[in-house]
């Protein structure tokens, strides 16, 4: 409230109200008392102030109170810079900054005579946007137009010009303090204060003028040049801009500093925990007049905790750096880490939470302090002077944990204290929705009082062990449980009863009582006035204490003020705790810089000199020199000998192992889990393609290409290259040739360094230039360095900062339609925030590795983090996860002596000494044994003794993890020096594992590695850690993070003792232990006690005899029962070329190494195992891998149908004794030695619970959304963990995903649709999985480019008519003379007729009846298909898209759909006996094919060409394609098949399907059948096409005749083609060469255009009725092509002469066999049918639509679950009560006849000498029966049936041509008759007319009908017997 208004109140009245309010808030626990300002100002009976009231009575007020206390515990001031921005405009104007009453802000009166109208400046010029929107406004360079809001004109925006340096950038950063603006109206320039400017433009504010509050929008010009409101000015983001209060440390990133740099704004994963609500008061302003300056000390950063839980305060408050005291010093950057000496350093202050309003009120985001405020006097009692030499005297740098209330200001030696916001957010009440509160078991009303918070904090501190450090996540759960208990208690109490709160009087003694059990480790200091008193007292006591005096670990300072309520903070004094807390505030980058600084500036010199002597006090260097001299020139024997045996260096260098271990590194395998995950990835890609978002069109691509981006690690690059080469993926994807793939692999792996930009641009060029290639960008280890480009450019950080963001999130990547992004990570938590760019549905998680179940024949199981934690319960004497207690004690002693050094420096120096002395103790100075920790000693003993035990020279690897590069280099130099002086340089190698450099290994060790490998070229050097398998070595692994490198099976020890309290995030900690994760023998997990409990002696004895080895192998290879075993889809032993027998032989020949050898990560299932050996024999294996995707592809376009895959096979898991190098001993996990801090988090696992590392903040780049959140459940799968993190974590400002904020319009976040995330534990095999994914993705794309076509041999070839006349081979066209003399072959040869009735020929009569096999017709026969590659001449369905046929397929604009016009076309049909009205839908672009009436409205005809036309770019015949149920799958895109030439294509569709076809084929002409044919079969479509075409031919003849063209010159042919015709081929017979061999057939794919143009060029074509081509089969022989033309049936694709066939009709009733029926009619009319045998048609197997059967159901459904209806139920007796069916009568009849031959024609079964006589029809009456087709028409040509006795007579809807002359045919005795008619009366008339009763006997019960209701017009039939 400031002093501005103080004088307006009577002090007595103020104090009374104030005390009442405080008292009420203390007494009250449920009812919220009214805020005191409401009592004072808003009482209804309050009189207006009299002038007497408004007297300055400041002296009567408690100054401290006035300065510090307001209603919200916030501060108010009249004349400062800072912001207290409210979200709402209205709130802005209704509340002052302190939420005091809206007393108008006192502005200077406007100059006399000036304009004061709202919306105009004082010069009277209009500033409103509506007036200026069309004006051209000139503004100076560097200025922007912005919009200001005036409270008096809410609907208007005022236009201003502001210097953009004073505005924030897009990320809310970098706005200079102050203001510079110009008036757009009158042109006045140079306003330097916003207050002054706001007066000039008449804002008339009721509150303090602030640019942040009143400058609202950027103004932008639209494309029309109109100035309009643009985006909001991003002031909000300023909140995160400030840095913390700086301590006066000497350098930027001192570990002692409480500074949090602007780059990170983090305290090791914790956002500093308070939010700015208000800034410091300005000068006291007496009587309302503000003084402009002050000389008092600067009070530059007083900020307080908002009691209203604001959105920001959940986790985002930040600490600030104090700056110079001048108000408008523009040159000073707020993040400056070097404040001027002698200034006060403000420490974040936390205001008390008053009980004046509900704790969970609406959030009020408030903007933090962005600059320097006016200085103001600092009240006494508010300051703490830090004593000089505090750290030096006490050896402790105290850490002050911000608690609850206002922290004081610190003066003096502030570098010796640290202020930590670690727990501050735990004391805030976050804003949560009710549903979230309910999930947590809380209500909105019951939260903890401050008193309870204080007691809980003390309780927590007491409970912490002496080695434990307060952990924010742990304390949050304690607070949550306490709140849940309160809620439960509240619910349990009766309504009206109250929980008794802790009273202020009780608090001190309760606090002391709780602390009393802590054995003096927790002290409580209670003060009355302020926290400053308690802190001062604590620091003073500390500075006066002597080192030997015992300090408490924690001092809890409580200020029990009657005025302000209770406040508290915690001063951490524990040596270990204070250091750990201070160090944990630094990010990894910061503490590495800190260490670097300490090393560079020589701060470590004291420590270094300490370690110059051994533990016994000897000078280390001199001692080593002495040992070296004693040894002379000789060195310890490299292997196969004791440590005491020495040889000359030359001899040592020449020693090569006698044994070739044949590591067989190049053999590569894919294992079932990897295959499963690869398929999961593939199915997710398919899901994206099918999602309807149209973000991925897989049909578009024919190739797969990729690039793998890895972090900056040379070894990782080489490792990935090795995987790519071994997997053979480049050859499999067709990207490289076999010979060059090895060299060319390098262009596919790029690391994130400064060169990535150029390499990536090359890649993106490839992406743009190859639109038909699907590119996959794999971002491996994608959690590493995921910082944003912007934060990288602003901070002086690592060179890799923001590189990943620049690549992965650049616009080109997001927009490229042919680019998939696959992010791969073992620790994906940083990618799973609320701002994640990856949809949770696009995450693919590694399959659950459940070790509890029997996994059958899998010999290796994954041993990961949770297995390490669980192993602690196994009770083995040598646990796998260890903490070196002795080492920790030594460290603690040293840390006390060197308080100013970072603990990692101290730890590292000690570790170097430990290893050095262990080496000396084991070789020359046994007296040092007692001074090395047993852990270190045993590791070194194992390391240097194991090579001596065998002739192979194999040994173990030890990893020492040293994150700081400088420390790592120091360690390497020091250890190398000790090793060399001890003569061990040939015994083991020391390697620096620096990500930035390649591996460097001594020549003699390289020679040893080469001899083991056996087949390496001369220049080979190890490039990956796996190449070092078996080499005894120490790898000093350095770098900020481990980057996913895989370690060899010989890794035995992983020393993580340097990984301490700086690693308090889940990712940081788990990725370190991830180094040791690997696959182990399953015995390790099944029977760990036996497998792992081997003492040293037992290890030596464990070398197994040959017999043992034999038995073990047999056991290993035996498949387990009840297994979830791996099936040998692609990685089985046999497929990989390693049989179990050869394995056994091989491994028995090897000598066996000691049994405790960890495989770590072996070749098999380590990162990136791939599909099979890359050698020549791999081809078959690779083809097998996609068994789930259909048959494999052969080398040509076709291949044989694939057989089913083989059964389960045993898989060789890595480390199984296949390679023979390790013998059959168990593969064991490495031993991990941890620091105490890491061990307490990873080793504290209760049974079955997640390691408690999982409860930590997941990553330093993210923040918790709220301190109230459920615990990460132990049973959560990785999918559930992902959802948890997506709900409860946010990306920090420097995170690459931070910019992916909510879309204000839709309220959703933008996921990148083509981005996937693959997550799996470290070293589980993810690389192999994604390489396999690339392979099967390519296989699938090829599969999409393949088509399944029918591949069936012709049927009935043994009884076709011999051609008496044949043409010579090689003739392109038939000769009409000789062709007409050929007999017609009435047998149907199309394989689809294989289950239909044979057509009788004289030759058939001689066929033995046994030849025809009986087939179960109930079971639909699976037709043979084969996969072939689509070619450029294929017909396509809607799933094909390409640039060429886009116009053909789609409309160019949305309006074009309506451009199609609907035309009715009517003609009369004699067959139907009525007029038929069809509809044409004609797109505008196709209207040229039609003739319209003069008015252009009426469709007259479809244009036809002339017979004589010769146009190479057109086909003459219109193409008609009847289609039903295949709007998506029908092959109706003929663009490529017709080579893009103009053609007339008409889709013939049913009326009800027209909208669907029109939607999918908008550019096609549709011919819509009348509604009466909606249920008709394909016969109706063919009938109407032919009728329409003939009618059109007549119309065209008439039209062209008028133009003088003869009628016979008009082209009479149409093409009738099925919607499944996909490819066309031309065949020729190859001439046999000189040696006798079978004549071959050569085939070539040709276009439909070629076929049609060739057939249309047939001489005298108008004399042929039908022309067609044969069906393709892979079994086409030269024999079948011998005759180039056949006179026989043609199907599916025909050229039909509508003129000649005018009187031959398709049967429009038919569903089946309509084409054979029509062919027989045509032939019997004496017309020519010609088949071109040198062309063939491929038909696609389309699984939907077409002539699919109706699902026959009862017309009235009685119940849903009815038994299937059998074919014999399709008919019934007339007028019976039979179940009536809902299906067309004709359909029921045809289906019935197919199955009823036994009943209808018993004499005809298998009796082909006596066929059934069918008059004028061919119907399928079953394959057991032959039909003799006879036409009743006069002069028709029929088969010779003299002497044939028929077994039956079929009369189907016979017309008047059928007469009584049927009596001339002879029938067997007992032959049967079936007469079918439309109705009962015509049935009777037919029997009478044909005099059937003379020869046939009928019974009344032999009359039937189809089982339709009478409405559906059933068909009737009568059966009879020949007499």
From Swiss-Prot:
Comp. bias regions, Polar residues: 263-278, 296-307, 1119-1161
InterPro entries according to UniProt: GREB1, GREB1-like_2nd, GREB1-like_C, GREB1-like_cpSF2, GREB1_N, TAGT
Pfam families given in the database record: cpSF2-GREB1 (PF20692), GREB1_2nd (PF20688), GREB1_C (PF20267), GREB1_N (PF15782), TAGT (PF20691)
Tissue specificity statement from the Swiss-Prot or TrEMBL entry: Widely expressed, with prominent expression in the cochlea. Expressed at high levels in fetal kidney. In adult tissues, highest levels in vagina, cervix and epididymis.
One term under GO cellular component: membrane
Compositionally biased intervals (Acidic residues): 87-96
Primary location class: membrane
Resulting phenotype, residue 926 to V: Able to rescue renal hypoplasia in zebrafish morphants
Start-end of Low complexity biased regions: 252-262, 1195-1206
Membrane topology qualifier: Single-pass membrane protein
GO biological process, one term: uterus development
Keywords: Deafness, Developmental protein, Disease variant, Membrane, Non-syndromic deafness, Transmembrane, Transmembrane helix
Residue ranges crossing the lipid bilayer per the database entry: 1843-1862
Region Disordered, residue ranges: 87-111, 246-326, 1101-1222
Cell compartment(s), UniProt: Membrane
Recorded superkingdom: Eukaryota
Chain's role: Plays a major role in early metanephros and genital development.
Similarity comment text for this entry: Belongs to the GREB1 family.
Disease linked to the protein: Renal hypodysplasia/aplasia 3: A severe, autosomal dominant disease encompassing a spectrum of kidney development defects. Clinical manifestations are highly variable and include bilateral or unilateral renal agenesis, renal aplasia, hypoplasia, (cystic) dysplasia, severe obstructive uropathy, and vesicoureteral reflux. Bilateral renal agenesis is almost invariably fatal in utero or in the perinatal period. Unilateral renal agenesis can lead to future health issues including end-stage renal disease. Deafness, autosomal dominant, 80: A form of non-syndromic, sensorineural hearing loss. Sensorineural hearing loss results from damage to the neural receptors of the inner ear, the nerve pathways to the brain, or the area of the brain that receives sound information. DFNA80 is characterized by severe inner ear malformations, bilateral cochlear aplasia and absent eighth cranial nerve.
Name by which UniProt lists this protein: GREB1-like protein
Gene, per the UniProt record: GREB1L
